Amino acid sequence: MATPKSSSANRKKGGKKSHRKPKRTWNVYINRSLKSINNHMSMSGRTMKIVNSFVNDLFERIACEAATVVRVNKKRTLGARELQTAVRLVLPADLAKHAMAEGTKAVSHASS
């Protein structure tokens, strides 16, 4: 008969318990956007997971492309210009144009 593992088996060196990193989700922001469009609409949990996965994938693609742009230009810092270039490369033409306009508006709103 197998014995259950003790809690000390799950501890790292030094006697501390390992903690899981909390998963980062965009659920709050997705709900805010949905409510700003139509206050009476809601999303099911499954739909929220799908939209969250879509946003995470897009974020990952833009971040990877921005890192590549920085590396190609032999720079050390990621600026607004590199992000704009990454968005233009990742998104289709019309969608990229709208994303650029909204991003510029958000940055100017946050800085003022």
Swiss-Prot record:
CDD domains: HFD_H2B (cd22910). SUPFAM superfamilies: Histone-fold. Residues 10-24 have a biased composition (Basic residues). GO terms for molecular function: DNA binding; protein heterodimerization activity; structural constituent of chromatin. Keywords: Chromosome, DNA-binding, Nucleosome core, Nucleus. It is found in: Nucleus; Chromosome. Residues 1-24 are annotated as: Disordered. It comes from the Eukaryota. Pfam families: Histone. GO terms for cellular component: nucleosome; nucleus. The nucleosome is a histone octamer containing two molecules each of H2A, H2B, H3 and H4 assembled in one H3-H4 heterotetramer and two H2A-H2B heterodimers. The octamer wraps approximately 147 bp of DNA. Belongs to the histone H2B family. Core component of nucleosome. Nucleosomes wrap and compact DNA into chromatin, limiting DNA accessibility to the cellular machineries which require DNA as a template. Histones thereby play a central role in transcription regulation, DNA repair, DNA replication and chromosomal stability. DNA accessibility is regulated via a complex set of post-translational modifications of histones, also called histone code, and nucleosome remodeling. This is Histone H2B. It comes from Trypanosoma cruzi.
